[in-house]
Protein backbone atom coordinates (compact mmCIF):
# COMPACT_ATOMS: atom_id res chain seq x y z
CA UNK A 1 0.00 0.00 0.00
CA UNK A 2 1.23 3.49 -0.84
CA UNK A 3 0.01 6.97 -0.05
CA UNK A 4 -1.09 9.17 -2.95
CA UNK A 5 -2.06 12.84 -3.10
CA UNK A 6 -5.60 13.63 -4.21
CA UNK A 7 -6.21 16.26 -6.88
CA UNK A 8 -8.40 18.64 -4.90
CA UNK A 9 -6.54 18.92 -1.60
CA UNK A 10 -3.22 18.38 0.11
CA UNK A 11 -4.48 15.58 2.34
CA UNK A 12 -3.11 12.07 1.95
CA UNK A 13 -5.23 9.09 1.03
CA UNK A 14 -4.19 5.46 1.00
CA UNK A 15 -4.51 3.46 -2.21
CA UNK A 16 -3.08 0.28 -3.64
CA UNK A 17 -0.14 0.44 -6.04
CA UNK A 18 -1.97 -1.79 -8.52
CA UNK A 19 -4.74 0.76 -9.20
CA UNK A 20 -4.82 1.63 -12.88
CA UNK A 21 -5.54 5.35 -12.96
CA UNK A 22 -5.11 8.37 -10.69
CA UNK A 23 -6.46 11.82 -11.52
CA UNK A 24 -4.23 14.72 -10.50
CA UNK A 25 -5.04 18.16 -11.83
CA UNK A 26 -7.15 16.52 -14.53
CA UNK A 27 -4.22 14.42 -15.80
CA UNK A 28 -4.68 10.62 -15.78
CA UNK A 29 -1.53 8.74 -14.84
CA UNK A 30 -1.48 4.99 -15.22
CA UNK A 31 0.56 2.82 -12.86
CA UNK A 32 2.59 5.76 -11.66
CA UNK A 33 3.22 7.22 -8.24
CA UNK A 34 1.66 10.61 -7.44
CA UNK A 35 3.82 11.91 -4.63
CA UNK A 36 3.89 14.92 -2.34
CA UNK A 37 7.11 16.90 -2.50
CA UNK A 38 8.14 15.45 0.86
CA UNK A 39 9.64 11.95 0.50
CA UNK A 40 8.39 9.46 3.04
CA UNK A 41 10.04 6.11 3.74
CA UNK A 42 8.46 3.12 2.07
CA UNK A 43 7.80 0.84 5.01
CA UNK A 44 6.57 -2.29 3.30
CA UNK A 45 5.84 -3.11 -0.31
CA UNK A 46 5.51 -6.67 -1.52
CA UNK A 47 8.55 -8.00 -3.34
CA UNK A 48 8.37 -7.93 -7.10
CA UNK A 49 6.08 -4.89 -7.42
CA UNK A 50 7.24 -2.86 -10.40
CA UNK A 51 6.90 0.82 -11.16
CA UNK A 52 5.97 1.50 -14.78
CA UNK A 53 6.21 4.88 -16.39
CA UNK A 54 3.14 5.83 -18.46
CA UNK A 55 3.80 9.55 -18.69
CA UNK A 56 6.74 11.60 -17.47
CA UNK A 57 5.61 13.94 -14.73
CA UNK A 58 6.97 15.74 -11.70
CA UNK A 59 5.23 17.24 -8.72
CA UNK A 60 6.06 20.89 -8.31
CA UNK A 61 5.12 22.50 -4.98
CA UNK A 62 4.61 25.83 -6.74
CA UNK A 63 2.45 24.54 -9.54
CA UNK A 64 -0.84 25.09 -7.75
CA UNK A 65 -1.85 21.45 -7.78
CA UNK A 66 -0.98 20.97 -11.45
CA UNK A 67 1.13 18.15 -12.70
CA UNK A 68 4.74 18.76 -13.64
CA UNK A 69 7.19 15.97 -14.35
CA UNK A 70 7.27 13.14 -11.79
CA UNK A 71 9.44 10.26 -12.97
CA UNK A 72 9.58 6.64 -12.00
CA UNK A 73 12.10 4.17 -13.26
CA UNK A 74 10.39 1.70 -15.61
CA UNK A 75 10.37 -1.87 -14.34
CA UNK A 76 12.36 -0.93 -11.23
CA UNK A 77 11.77 -3.24 -8.28
CA UNK A 78 10.83 -1.37 -5.11
CA UNK A 79 12.90 -3.70 -3.02
CA UNK A 80 14.48 -7.09 -3.30
CA UNK A 81 15.13 -9.74 -0.73
CA UNK A 82 18.39 -8.08 0.23
CA UNK A 83 17.66 -4.36 0.17
CA UNK A 84 14.72 -2.12 0.93
CA UNK A 85 14.28 1.17 -0.92
CA UNK A 86 12.79 4.48 0.13
CA UNK A 87 10.78 6.82 -2.02
CA UNK A 88 13.74 9.17 -2.05
CA UNK A 89 15.78 6.48 -3.75
CA UNK A 90 13.05 5.69 -6.26
CA UNK A 91 11.85 9.10 -7.38
CA UNK A 92 13.67 11.80 -9.30
CA UNK A 93 12.15 15.24 -8.80
CA UNK A 94 12.88 18.56 -10.35
CA UNK A 95 10.92 21.52 -8.97
CA UNK A 96 11.97 23.90 -11.70
CA UNK A 97 8.94 25.07 -13.67
CA UNK A 98 11.21 25.57 -16.67
CA UNK A 99 11.28 21.81 -17.14
CA UNK A 100 7.54 21.52 -17.66
CA UNK A 101 6.94 20.18 -21.17
CA UNK A 102 3.78 20.45 -23.25
CA UNK A 103 5.14 18.13 -25.94
CA UNK A 104 2.46 15.76 -27.22
CA UNK A 105 3.25 12.09 -27.75
CA UNK A 106 3.89 11.04 -31.32
CA UNK A 107 0.87 9.40 -32.99
CA UNK A 108 0.98 5.62 -33.29
CA UNK A 109 1.13 3.93 -36.65
CA UNK A 110 -1.69 1.65 -37.75
CA UNK A 111 0.47 -1.42 -37.14
CA UNK A 112 1.36 -0.25 -33.62
CA UNK A 113 -2.29 0.40 -32.86
CA UNK A 114 -3.24 -3.10 -33.99
CA UNK A 115 -0.44 -4.86 -32.13
CA UNK A 116 -1.07 -2.92 -28.90
CA UNK A 117 -4.81 -3.56 -28.96
CA UNK A 118 -5.76 -5.63 -25.88
CA UNK A 119 -7.51 -8.28 -27.99
CA UNK A 120 -4.43 -8.58 -30.21
CA UNK A 121 -2.22 -8.96 -27.15
CA UNK A 122 -4.61 -11.52 -25.71
CA UNK A 123 -3.99 -13.74 -28.76
CA UNK A 124 -0.26 -12.79 -28.83
CA UNK A 125 -0.16 -11.17 -32.26
CA UNK A 126 2.94 -9.33 -31.09
CA UNK A 127 4.67 -12.70 -30.54
CA UNK A 128 4.16 -14.82 -33.68
CA UNK A 129 6.68 -17.49 -32.69
CA UNK A 130 3.92 -19.58 -31.11
CA UNK A 131 1.94 -19.66 -34.36
CA UNK A 132 5.03 -20.81 -36.26
CA UNK A 133 5.76 -23.58 -33.76
CA UNK A 134 2.15 -24.76 -34.11
CA UNK A 135 2.27 -24.61 -37.92
CA UNK A 136 5.53 -26.46 -38.61
CA UNK A 137 4.33 -29.99 -37.68
CA UNK A 138 1.37 -29.41 -40.02
CA UNK A 139 3.72 -28.30 -42.78
CA UNK A 140 5.99 -31.30 -42.26
CA UNK A 141 3.10 -33.74 -42.59
CA UNK A 142 1.62 -32.01 -45.65
CA UNK A 143 5.02 -31.98 -47.37
CA UNK A 144 5.72 -35.64 -46.53
CA UNK A 145 2.37 -36.70 -47.99
CA UNK A 146 3.09 -35.04 -51.35
CA UNK A 147 3.75 -37.43 -54.27
CA UNK A 148 7.35 -37.89 -55.35
CA UNK A 149 8.56 -34.97 -57.44
CA UNK A 150 5.66 -32.71 -56.41
CA UNK A 151 5.47 -29.58 -54.29
CA UNK A 152 3.24 -29.64 -51.19
CA UNK A 153 -0.30 -28.45 -51.80
CA UNK A 154 -0.30 -24.66 -51.44
CA UNK A 155 -4.00 -24.34 -50.59
CA UNK A 156 -3.72 -26.88 -47.77
CA UNK A 157 -0.65 -25.11 -46.41
CA UNK A 158 -2.56 -21.82 -46.47
CA UNK A 159 -5.52 -23.31 -44.60
CA UNK A 160 -3.28 -24.79 -41.94
CA UNK A 161 -1.32 -21.54 -41.63
CA UNK A 162 -4.52 -19.62 -40.96
CA UNK A 163 -5.73 -22.33 -38.61
CA UNK A 164 -2.46 -22.27 -36.65
CA UNK A 165 -2.72 -18.51 -36.24
CA UNK A 166 -6.34 -18.62 -35.04
CA UNK A 167 -6.08 -21.67 -32.80
CA UNK A 168 -2.87 -20.51 -31.19
CA UNK A 169 -4.70 -17.28 -30.34
CA UNK A 170 -7.61 -19.28 -28.92
CA UNK A 171 -5.20 -21.35 -26.86
CA UNK A 172 -3.58 -18.22 -25.44
CA UNK A 173 -7.01 -16.83 -24.58
CA UNK A 174 -7.96 -20.02 -22.74
CA UNK A 175 -4.60 -20.02 -20.98
CA UNK A 176 -5.03 -16.43 -19.76
CA UNK A 177 -8.56 -17.15 -18.56
CA UNK A 178 -7.37 -20.14 -16.51
CA UNK A 179 -4.25 -18.35 -15.21
CA UNK A 180 -5.74 -14.97 -14.37
CA UNK A 181 -5.05 -15.48 -10.66
CA UNK A 182 -1.45 -16.51 -11.35
CA UNK A 183 -0.33 -14.12 -14.09
CA UNK A 184 -0.59 -11.09 -11.83
CA UNK A 185 2.03 -12.60 -9.52
CA UNK A 186 4.60 -13.35 -12.22
CA UNK A 187 6.81 -10.53 -13.46
CA UNK A 188 6.70 -11.58 -17.13
CA UNK A 189 2.90 -11.91 -17.31
CA UNK A 190 1.55 -9.24 -14.95
CA UNK A 191 0.67 -6.85 -17.80
CA UNK A 192 -1.51 -9.23 -19.80
CA UNK A 193 -4.88 -7.68 -20.71
CA UNK A 194 -7.05 -9.70 -18.32
CA UNK A 195 -4.73 -9.15 -15.36
CA UNK A 196 -4.32 -5.44 -16.10
CA UNK A 197 -8.08 -4.96 -16.28
CA UNK A 198 -8.08 -3.90 -19.93
CA UNK A 199 -10.51 -6.73 -20.72
CA UNK A 200 -13.16 -8.42 -18.63
CA UNK A 201 -13.93 -12.12 -18.40
CA UNK A 202 -17.02 -11.53 -20.56
CA UNK A 203 -14.83 -9.90 -23.21
CA UNK A 204 -12.51 -12.90 -23.17
CA UNK A 205 -15.39 -15.39 -23.49
CA UNK A 206 -16.85 -13.49 -26.42
CA UNK A 207 -13.47 -13.26 -28.14
CA UNK A 208 -12.77 -16.95 -27.55
CA UNK A 209 -16.10 -17.85 -29.15
CA UNK A 210 -15.26 -15.75 -32.19
CA UNK A 211 -11.85 -17.42 -32.58
CA UNK A 212 -13.27 -20.91 -32.24
CA UNK A 213 -15.94 -20.03 -34.80
CA UNK A 214 -13.30 -18.99 -37.33
CA UNK A 215 -11.30 -22.11 -36.53
CA UNK A 216 -14.38 -24.26 -37.18
CA UNK A 217 -14.92 -22.62 -40.57
CA UNK A 218 -11.34 -23.47 -41.52
CA UNK A 219 -11.73 -27.05 -40.28
CA UNK A 220 -14.90 -27.51 -42.35
CA UNK A 221 -12.82 -26.97 -45.50
CA UNK A 222 -11.21 -30.37 -44.88
CA UNK A 223 -12.56 -33.90 -45.40
CA UNK A 224 -14.76 -35.55 -42.76
CA UNK A 225 -11.97 -37.77 -41.45
CA UNK A 226 -9.87 -34.67 -40.81
CA UNK A 227 -12.80 -32.76 -39.28
CA UNK A 228 -13.32 -35.48 -36.67
CA UNK A 229 -9.58 -35.83 -36.06
CA UNK A 230 -9.12 -32.07 -35.70
CA UNK A 231 -12.08 -31.63 -33.35
CA UNK A 232 -10.73 -34.38 -31.09
CA UNK A 233 -7.75 -32.20 -30.19
CA UNK A 234 -9.91 -29.51 -28.57
CA UNK A 235 -9.88 -31.37 -25.25
CA UNK A 236 -6.10 -31.10 -25.10
CA UNK A 237 -6.31 -27.38 -25.83
CA UNK A 238 -8.69 -26.87 -22.90
CA UNK A 239 -6.93 -28.99 -20.26
CA UNK A 240 -3.35 -27.91 -20.98
CA UNK A 241 -3.45 -24.75 -18.78
CA UNK A 242 -4.59 -26.90 -15.83
CA UNK A 243 -1.69 -29.33 -16.10
CA UNK A 244 0.80 -26.91 -14.53
CA UNK A 245 -1.24 -27.16 -11.32
CA UNK A 246 -1.30 -30.97 -11.36
CA UNK A 247 1.92 -32.35 -12.83
CA UNK A 248 5.53 -31.41 -13.52
CA UNK A 249 4.95 -32.49 -17.14
CA UNK A 250 2.65 -29.83 -18.65
CA UNK A 251 5.14 -29.59 -21.52
CA UNK A 252 4.23 -33.15 -22.50
CA UNK A 253 0.56 -32.20 -22.80
CA UNK A 254 1.54 -29.08 -24.74
CA UNK A 255 3.58 -31.26 -27.10
CA UNK A 256 0.63 -33.57 -27.69
CA UNK A 257 -1.50 -30.50 -28.46
CA UNK A 258 0.92 -28.52 -30.59
CA UNK A 259 1.92 -31.45 -32.80
CA UNK A 260 -1.57 -32.71 -33.63
CA UNK A 261 -1.02 -31.22 -37.06
CA UNK A 262 1.53 -33.97 -37.77
CA UNK A 263 -1.47 -36.31 -37.98
CA UNK A 264 -3.99 -33.85 -39.37
CA UNK A 265 -1.84 -32.60 -42.25
CA UNK A 266 -1.51 -36.07 -43.78
CA UNK A 267 -5.21 -36.86 -43.48
CA UNK A 268 -6.12 -33.51 -45.04
CA UNK A 269 -4.29 -34.42 -48.25
CA UNK A 270 -4.68 -38.22 -48.33
CA UNK A 271 -8.07 -38.75 -46.68
CA UNK A 272 -6.69 -40.73 -43.71
CA UNK A 273 -3.59 -41.03 -41.55
CA UNK A 274 -0.70 -43.27 -42.58
CA UNK A 275 0.26 -44.20 -39.02
CA UNK A 276 3.56 -45.85 -39.88
CA UNK A 277 4.83 -42.50 -41.19
CA UNK A 278 2.87 -40.02 -39.06
CA UNK A 279 3.24 -41.58 -35.62
CA UNK A 280 7.08 -41.34 -35.56
CA UNK A 281 6.75 -37.76 -36.85
CA UNK A 282 4.24 -36.97 -34.09
CA UNK A 283 6.49 -38.43 -31.38
CA UNK A 284 9.43 -36.46 -32.75
CA UNK A 285 7.36 -33.27 -32.58
CA UNK A 286 6.29 -33.97 -28.99
CA UNK A 287 9.92 -34.43 -27.95
CA UNK A 288 10.84 -31.21 -29.76
CA UNK A 289 8.12 -29.30 -27.90
CA UNK A 290 9.35 -30.60 -24.55
CA UNK A 291 12.83 -29.32 -25.45
CA UNK A 292 11.89 -25.79 -26.47
CA UNK A 293 9.14 -25.27 -23.88
CA UNK A 294 11.38 -26.45 -21.05
CA UNK A 295 13.86 -23.79 -22.15
CA UNK A 296 10.99 -21.29 -22.20
CA UNK A 297 9.80 -22.32 -18.72
CA UNK A 298 13.20 -21.57 -17.21
CA UNK A 299 12.37 -17.87 -17.61
CA UNK A 300 9.70 -18.12 -14.89
CA UNK A 301 11.07 -20.88 -12.69
CA UNK A 302 11.68 -18.62 -9.66
CA UNK A 303 8.15 -17.20 -9.68
CA UNK A 304 6.68 -20.62 -10.52
CA UNK A 305 8.43 -22.26 -7.57
CA UNK A 306 7.12 -19.59 -5.19
CA UNK A 307 3.57 -19.97 -6.52
CA UNK A 308 3.60 -23.76 -6.59
CA UNK A 309 3.40 -23.92 -10.39
CA UNK A 310 4.90 -27.09 -11.86
CA UNK A 311 6.98 -27.47 -15.02
CA UNK A 312 9.69 -29.62 -16.53
CA UNK A 313 12.12 -26.76 -15.88
CA UNK A 314 11.57 -27.22 -12.14
CA UNK A 315 11.45 -31.02 -12.46
CA UNK A 316 14.73 -31.26 -14.38
CA UNK A 317 16.52 -28.56 -12.38
CA UNK A 318 20.30 -28.68 -12.77
CA UNK A 319 19.98 -31.81 -14.95
CA UNK A 320 18.06 -29.89 -17.61
CA UNK A 321 20.74 -30.22 -20.28
CA UNK A 322 20.93 -33.99 -19.80
CA UNK A 323 17.15 -34.33 -20.16
CA UNK A 324 17.06 -32.04 -23.19
CA UNK A 325 19.81 -34.09 -24.83
CA UNK A 326 17.75 -37.24 -24.36
CA UNK A 327 14.59 -35.73 -25.84
CA UNK A 328 16.56 -34.24 -28.74
CA UNK A 329 18.00 -37.67 -29.51
CA UNK A 330 14.50 -39.16 -29.45
CA UNK A 331 13.33 -36.43 -31.81
CA UNK A 332 16.07 -37.22 -34.31
CA UNK A 333 15.25 -40.93 -34.08
CA UNK A 334 11.59 -40.24 -34.85
CA UNK A 335 12.49 -38.09 -37.85
CA UNK A 336 14.80 -40.78 -39.25
CA UNK A 337 12.12 -43.46 -38.81
CA UNK A 338 9.47 -41.34 -40.53
CA UNK A 339 11.85 -40.55 -43.38
CA UNK A 340 12.63 -44.22 -43.93
CA UNK A 341 8.93 -45.13 -44.14
CA UNK A 342 8.38 -42.32 -46.67
CA UNK A 343 11.50 -43.35 -48.65
CA UNK A 344 13.03 -39.92 -48.30
CA UNK A 345 16.29 -38.98 -49.99
CA UNK A 346 19.56 -37.33 -48.99
CA UNK A 347 18.25 -33.71 -48.79
CA UNK A 348 15.88 -34.82 -46.03
CA UNK A 349 18.58 -36.58 -44.03
CA UNK A 350 20.92 -33.64 -44.55
CA UNK A 351 18.29 -31.39 -42.97
CA UNK A 352 17.97 -33.81 -40.05
CA UNK A 353 21.74 -33.61 -39.60
CA UNK A 354 21.64 -29.81 -39.55
CA UNK A 355 18.84 -29.93 -36.98
CA UNK A 356 20.94 -32.24 -34.82
CA UNK A 357 23.76 -29.72 -34.85
CA UNK A 358 21.35 -26.86 -34.14
CA UNK A 359 19.86 -28.61 -31.11
CA UNK A 360 23.29 -29.59 -29.83
CA UNK A 361 24.41 -25.96 -29.99
CA UNK A 362 21.22 -24.82 -28.26
CA UNK A 363 21.72 -27.18 -25.36
CA UNK A 364 25.48 -26.71 -25.04
CA UNK A 365 25.34 -22.90 -24.99
CA UNK A 366 22.11 -22.62 -22.95
CA UNK A 367 22.25 -20.67 -19.69
CA UNK A 368 19.19 -21.82 -17.79
CA UNK A 369 19.62 -19.03 -15.22
CA UNK A 370 19.56 -16.26 -17.84
CA UNK A 371 15.98 -15.44 -18.94
CA UNK A 372 17.20 -13.47 -21.95
CA UNK A 373 19.27 -16.39 -23.21
CA UNK A 374 16.37 -18.78 -22.62
CA UNK A 375 14.07 -16.54 -24.67
CA UNK A 376 16.62 -16.35 -27.50
CA UNK A 377 17.10 -20.12 -27.59
CA UNK A 378 13.35 -20.68 -27.53
CA UNK A 379 12.73 -18.37 -30.50
CA UNK A 380 15.55 -20.03 -32.49
CA UNK A 381 13.45 -23.20 -32.70
CA UNK A 382 11.55 -21.53 -35.52
CA UNK A 383 14.69 -22.27 -37.56
CA UNK A 384 14.45 -25.96 -36.66
CA UNK A 385 10.93 -26.16 -38.08
CA UNK A 386 11.88 -24.29 -41.24
CA UNK A 387 15.00 -26.39 -41.89
CA UNK A 388 13.06 -29.65 -41.62
CA UNK A 389 10.25 -28.36 -43.85
CA UNK A 390 12.74 -27.36 -46.57
CA UNK A 391 14.49 -30.72 -46.21
CA UNK A 392 11.21 -32.58 -46.74
CA UNK A 393 10.27 -30.50 -49.78
CA UNK A 394 13.69 -30.85 -51.42
CA UNK A 395 13.87 -34.54 -50.54
CA UNK A 396 10.47 -35.18 -52.13
CA UNK A 397 11.40 -33.28 -55.28
CA UNK A 398 14.70 -35.13 -55.54
CA UNK A 399 12.91 -38.45 -55.04
CA UNK A 400 10.76 -37.71 -58.09
CA UNK A 401 13.83 -36.73 -60.10
CA UNK A 402 15.59 -39.96 -59.10
CA UNK A 403 12.60 -42.07 -60.06
CA UNK A 404 12.34 -40.42 -63.48
CA UNK A 405 16.06 -40.80 -64.03
CA UNK A 406 15.87 -44.47 -63.02
CA UNK A 407 12.98 -45.18 -65.39
CA UNK A 408 14.78 -43.44 -68.24
CA UNK A 409 17.91 -45.46 -67.58
CA UNK A 410 15.94 -48.72 -67.44
CA UNK A 411 14.12 -47.97 -70.71
CA UNK A 412 17.35 -47.03 -72.46
CA UNK A 413 19.18 -50.15 -71.33
CA UNK A 414 16.23 -52.36 -72.31
CA UNK A 415 16.12 -50.85 -75.79
CA UNK A 416 19.86 -51.24 -76.22
CA UNK A 417 19.86 -54.87 -75.15
CA UNK A 418 16.96 -55.69 -77.49
CA UNK A 419 18.61 -54.18 -80.55
CA UNK A 420 21.98 -55.77 -79.85
CA UNK A 421 20.73 -59.32 -79.16
CA UNK A 422 21.81 -61.86 -81.96
CA UNK A 423 18.72 -64.01 -81.60
CA UNK A 424 16.50 -60.97 -81.94
CA UNK A 425 18.29 -59.97 -85.13
CA UNK A 426 17.93 -63.44 -86.68
CA UNK A 427 14.25 -63.59 -85.79
CA UNK A 428 13.64 -60.16 -87.34
CA UNK A 429 15.44 -61.21 -90.54
CA UNK A 430 13.43 -64.44 -90.82
CA UNK A 431 10.18 -62.55 -90.37
CA UNK A 432 11.08 -60.08 -93.12
CA UNK A 433 12.12 -62.94 -95.47
CA UNK A 434 8.80 -64.78 -95.25
CA UNK A 435 6.53 -61.73 -95.26
CA UNK A 436 6.31 -61.30 -99.13
CA UNK A 437 5.31 -64.96 -99.56
CA UNK A 438 2.38 -64.53 -97.18
CA UNK A 439 1.29 -61.41 -99.00
CA UNK A 440 1.38 -63.21 -102.41
CA UNK A 441 -0.67 -66.12 -101.17
UniProtKB/Swiss-Prot annotation:
Membrane topology recorded in Swiss-Prot or TrEMBL: Multi-pass membrane protein
Region (Disordered): 405-441
Coiled coil location: none
Mitochondrion recorded as keyword: yes
Keyword Glycoprotein annotated: no
Record GO cellular component, one term: RNA polymerase III complex
Location within or outside the cell: Mitochondrion inner membrane
Listed Polar residues bias regions: 432-441
TM region(s), chain numbering: 129-149, 154-174, 204-224, 225-245, 246-266, 271-291, 322-342, 378-398
Cofactors, names only: Mg(2+)
Stretches with biased composition (Low complexity): 408-424
PROSITE patterns listed in its UniProt record: UBIA (PS00943)
Its EC number(s): 2.5.1.39
Predominant localisation class: mitochondrion
Pathway annotation: Cofactor biosynthesis; ubiquinone biosynthesis
Domain of life assignment: Eukaryota
GO MF, one example: 4-hydroxybenzoate polyprenyltransferase activity
GO terms under biological process: isoprenoid biosynthetic process; transcription by RNA polymerase I; transcription by RNA polymerase III; ubiquinone biosynthetic process
One Pfam family cited in the UniProt record for this chain: UbiA
Keywords for the protein's UniProt record, in alphabetical order: Isoprene biosynthesis, Membrane, Mitochondrion, Mitochondrion inner membrane, Transferase, Transit peptide, Transmembrane, Transmembrane helix, Ubiquinone biosynthesis
Catalytic activity line of the entry: an all-trans-polyprenyl diphosphate + 4-hydroxybenzoate = a 4-hydroxy-3-(all-trans-polyprenyl)benzoate + diphosphate
Transit peptide range per the UniProt entry: 1-95
Name of the top EC class for this enzyme: transferase
Functional description taken from the UniProt entry: Catalyzes the prenylation of para-hydroxybenzoate (PHB) with an all-trans polyprenyl group. Mediates the second step in the final reaction sequence of coenzyme Q (CoQ) biosynthesis, which is the condensation of the polyisoprenoid side chain with PHB, generating the first membrane-bound Q intermediate.
HAMAP family in alphabetical order: UbiA (MF_01635)
Protein name stated in the entry: 4-hydroxybenzoate polyprenyltransferase, mitochondrial
Amino acid sequence: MLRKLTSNSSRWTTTHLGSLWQEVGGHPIRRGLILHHHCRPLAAVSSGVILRQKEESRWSPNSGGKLANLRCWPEYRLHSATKRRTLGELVLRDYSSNNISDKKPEPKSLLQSIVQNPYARLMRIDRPIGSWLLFWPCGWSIALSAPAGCWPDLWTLTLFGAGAFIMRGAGCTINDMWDRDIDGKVARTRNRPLVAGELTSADAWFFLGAQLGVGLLILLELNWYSIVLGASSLGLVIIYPLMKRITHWPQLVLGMTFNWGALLGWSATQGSVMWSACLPLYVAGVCWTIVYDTIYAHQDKVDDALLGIKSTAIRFGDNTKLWLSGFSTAMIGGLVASGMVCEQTWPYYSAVGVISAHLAHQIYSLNIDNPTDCATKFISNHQVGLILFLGIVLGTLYKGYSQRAGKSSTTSSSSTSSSSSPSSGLLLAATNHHQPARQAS
